[in-house]
Amino acid sequence: MSAATKKRYITNKVGSEFYELVDEDIIAQVRQSRGNNLHEVLDQNGDSYVVSMPTKFRKSVWLRRDQFVVVRPITEGDKVKGEIEYILDQDNVLYIRELGKWPTCFEENALKMTREAKRGQTSDKMIDDDMLPPSESEEEDESEGEETYDEDDVDDEEEEEFDTYNPNRMQAPSK
């Protein structure tokens, strides 16, 4: 596989698949980048440590601060205590939350990603009044406030024809 094909494959995989958590996986939030593909994360247990990004993600997927990742712990290193297994996008976060595997310490961040939070709606399942058709009482109220006009009330000035000029069609009409 060429480098461009690998990059395209990883980008499509991260953007289109839902990740299934394994028992040893830890969900963590990226706090800062340390450089050299090392990132400081805060995991679901409240521990802060450095994790490495594997070569399959390098130069194809970028991490931002406060983004969520799945970390697989490693035992080899002193400073680097895990490796990024998967980068979670918004859809994956909501999917894991639906499954009931989302950590409670990150619940507030997951709630901000829901459609209701983005629209500023609360959790009551009411339909907004603007989305409903008008009721009979509203139609009566509107008809009382409207003024009716007869044809005789219309000013004569409005009945005059206006000469329209379209520069793309012809010369301007001469008066």
From Swiss-Prot:
Signal peptide bounds: none
The keyword Glycoprotein appears for this protein: no
PROSITE patterns cross-referenced by the UniProt entry: S1_IF1_TYPE
Stretches with biased composition (Polar residues): 165-175
GO cellular component: nucleus
The keyword Electron transport is annotated on this UniProt entry: no
Chain positions covered by the region annotation Disordered: 116-175
S1-like domain sequence ranges: 5-89
Acidic residues biased stretches: 129-163
SUPFAM superfamilies: Nucleic acid-binding proteins (SSF50249)
One GO MF term attached to the UniProt entry: translation initiation factor activity
Disulfide bonds listed in the record: none
Sequence ranges of Basic and acidic residues compositional bias: 116-128
Superkingdom in the source lineage: Eukaryota
Protein keywords: RNA-binding
Assigned protein family: Belongs to the EIF1AD family.
Protein name in the entry: Probable RNA-binding protein EIF1AD
Organism: Caenorhabditis elegans
